[in-house]
């Protein structure tokens, strides 16, 4: 009888892909099968995020809950970015945890499950040529890593300390994985990296000198690929070559994540982001000009140390000019191992909270007018998910979530949809034809 694996995934799309790799290793090469029932699992894994402080604080209460609910003899393992930076401390605080596996050590999962109190958190471990097995949480799209780690030194970010220096995965391995995904039914390819458009800079072999724009073109030339998405690009590397490929390649989805973080050049300098307010606006407005239908999302941190009212006003100015379709906004969260946590002039929580509320309220007002303009437009929607009430949901090329009345027969299909009911976060429509 097979052992049962329960896994909970927190955080970003890269964690989703890491969990897929773990599941593949254990279900295809070890005697495990996946379960959604915590209490019947023989192995319980939590794949963690450490970008902000709150999820880290929740970790120990969560694994304590798992320990109470698990069946006798079941093992608990902690994986991911929090595992990388806390390491042995996790087992010291929670001795019922069987092992700790860092974000850069996914390929070691089969070894650590056979050890007691193993801690594998080497952020210099090279997984770039590791031949991951096939497993996808969605039959309709494939998450594919194109790089591992990050070579940026943003002063607020712990990721370089949990995922290590950036290494680009060889293009031939990426294309091989894309072909396998297409052969097993995926029509949408989602390329992943901390800074995808920095791809290729780690290659020392000149014969392999491929940048992200080249890689996009190569992926798009594979038969069976209908759509290409990617996250997360860095504004600093949004050169004209990249924007031109984005605008003209019909397989590249017209949605772009542009992490602003702050609209103040002074704050951006303190964050070590490498660009200015003016650079960001130039890239965003050029993108709007080249691709009028583009959907631009962003990340914004408010309350970064030293952020004045004038600095915050600069952020609001960028928001009003770019009119982002989606904003992921947060109060600054001091992280261990980052320079910004020791900066002077930390912003009081009540000030950061006020700024966050103002930003979020402003964006909600914008969304009302942005979404209203979608009414009566016709989009091609790729349906991926059943929703309550007899609805099926999918995404447009430019990343609107659209739901229509329908059945599971729509799943995995591209259909034309006329938008009948705009909404802030999603649209409703009806099938055309």
Curated annotation (Swiss-Prot):
UniProt subcellular location: Cytoplasm
Cofactor remark: Binds 2 [4Fe-4S] clusters. One cluster is coordinated with 3 cysteines and an exchangeable S-adenosyl-L-methionine.
Enzyme nomenclature, EC number: 2.8.4.3
Chain ranges of the Radical SAM core domain: 136-371
Record-linked Gene3D superfamilies: Methylthiotransferase, N-terminal domain, tm_1862 like domain
Binding site for [4Fe-4S] cluster 1: 12, 49, 81
Binding residues annotated for [4Fe-4S] cluster 2, in chain numbering: 150, 154, 157
Ranges of residues in domain MTTase N-terminal: 3-118
InterPro entries with a match to the protein in the record: Elp3/MiaA/NifB-like_rSAM, Methylthiotransferase, Methylthiotransferase_CS, Methylthiotransferase_N, Methylthiotransferase_N_sf, MiaB_methiolase, rSAM, rSAM_horseshoe
Cofactor names: [4Fe-4S] cluster
GO-annotated molecular function: 4 iron, 4 sulfur cluster binding; metal ion binding; N6-isopentenyladenosine methylthiotransferase activity
GO terms under cellular component: cytosol
Catalytic activity: N(6)-dimethylallyladenosine(37) in tRNA + (sulfur carrier)-SH + AH2 + 2 S-adenosyl-L-methionine = 2-methylsulfanyl-N(6)-dimethylallyladenosine(37) in tRNA + (sulfur carrier)-H + 5'-deoxyadenosine + L-methionine + A + S-adenosyl-L-homocysteine + 2 H(+)
TRAM domain mapped to chain residues: 372-433
Keywords from the UniProt entry: 4Fe-4S, Cytoplasm, Iron, Iron-sulfur, Metal-binding, S-adenosyl-L-methionine, Transferase, tRNA processing
Iron listed as a keyword: yes
Similarity comment: Belongs to the methylthiotransferase family. MiaB subfamily.
Listed NCBIfam families: miaB-methiolase, MiaB/RimO family radical SAM methylthiotransferase
Binding partners and assembly: Monomer.
PANTHER family for this protein: CDK5 REGULATORY SUBUNIT-ASSOCIATED PROTEIN 1, MITOCHONDRIAL TRNA METHYLTHIOTRANSFERASE CDK5RAP1
Protein function: Catalyzes the methylthiolation of N6-(dimethylallyl)adenosine (i(6)A), leading to the formation of 2-methylthio-N6-(dimethylallyl)adenosine (ms(2)i(6)A) at position 37 in tRNAs that read codons beginning with uridine.
Protein name as it appears in the record: tRNA-2-methylthio-N(6)-dimethylallyladenosine synthase
């Amino acid at each position: 009888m097979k052992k049962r694996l329960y896994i909970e995934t927190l955080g970003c799309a890269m964690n989703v892909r890491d969990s897929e790799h773990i599941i593949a290793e254990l279900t295809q090469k070890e005697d495990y099968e996946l379960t959604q029932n915590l209490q019947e699992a023989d192995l319980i894994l939590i794949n963690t995020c450490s970008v902000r402080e709150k999820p880290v604080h929740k970790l120990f209460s969560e694994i304590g809950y798992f320990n109470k609910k698990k069946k006798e003899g079941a093992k608990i393992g902690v994986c991911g970015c929090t595992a990388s930076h806390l390491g042995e401390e996790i087992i010291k605080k929670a001795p019922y945890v069987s092992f700790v596996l860092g974000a850069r050590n996914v390929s070691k999962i089969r070894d650590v499950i056979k050890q007691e109190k193993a801690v594998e958190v080497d952020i210099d471990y090279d997984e770039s040529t590791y031949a991951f097995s096939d497993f996808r949480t969605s039959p309709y799209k494939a998450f594919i890593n194109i790089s591992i780690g990050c070579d940026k030194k943003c002063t607020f970010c712990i990721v370089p300390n949990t995922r290590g220096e950036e290494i680009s995965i060889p293009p031939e391995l990426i294309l091989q994985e894309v072909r396998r995904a297409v052969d097993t039914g995926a029509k949408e390819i989602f390329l992943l990296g901390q800074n995808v458009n920095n791809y290729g800079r780690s290659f020392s072999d000149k014969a392999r000198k491929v940048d992200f724009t080249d890689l996009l073109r190569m992926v798009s030339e594979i038969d069976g690929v209908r759509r290409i998405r990617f996250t997360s690009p860095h504004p600093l590397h949004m050169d004209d070559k990249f924007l031109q490929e984005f605008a003209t390649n019909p397989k590249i989805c017209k949605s772009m994540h542009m992490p602003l973080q702050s609209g103040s050049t002074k704050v951006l300098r303190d964050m070590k982001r490498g660009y200015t307010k003016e650079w960001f606006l130039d890239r965003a407005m050029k993108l709007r000009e080249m691709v009028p239908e583009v959907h631009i999302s962003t990340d914004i941190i408010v309350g970064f140390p030293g952020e004045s009212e004038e600095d915050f006003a600069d952020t609001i100015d960028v928001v009003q000019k770019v009119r982002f379709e989606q904003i992921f906004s947060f109060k600054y969260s001091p992280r261990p191992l980052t320079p910004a946590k020791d900066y002077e002039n930390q912003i009081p929580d009540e000030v950061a909270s006020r700024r966050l509320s103002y930003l979020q309220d402003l964006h909600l007002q914008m969304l009302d007018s942005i979404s209203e303009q979608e009414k009566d437009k016709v989009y091609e929607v790729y349906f991926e998910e059943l929703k309550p009430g007899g609805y099926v949901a999918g995404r447009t090329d430019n990343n609107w979530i659209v739901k229509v009345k329908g059945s599971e027969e729509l799943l995995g299909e591209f259909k034309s949809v006329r938008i009948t009911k705009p909404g802030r976060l999603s649209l409703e429509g009806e099938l055309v034809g």
